[in-house]
């Protein structure tokens, strides 16, 4: 059984693949309610990781809110316009955990990021927090 093997060109690879959001049901807000969750590009993921660190390279206090920050980054309307801003992070943290985790899990899934990647960011921030 042989499968076709096609090596793509540099030009093909450098053309961004059109992002496709994943609609996450949020029935807590009413029947049929969804939040579109968009994938992060490689550049956006790198920026997200960098935001979790201070200028000294150590995780900053904001890294504790890694899930909330991921929700801000990935939840957008049907046109890709962000639903939330960084000013909403504290309020997102007050939201029902099940809803937030659903959005976080969808963001990880569509972006190809593992939950271990996010846990590592959060763990690194814990190491710098006073006991």
Identify the residue ranges that each predicted region occupies.
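Short, surface-exposed, charged amphipathic helix/loop patches that serve as local interaction elements
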Residues: 2-3, 29-131
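Extended acidic low-complexity intrinsically disordered regions
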Residues: 1-20
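Short acidic-hydrophobic surface loop/beta-edge motif
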Residues: 20-30
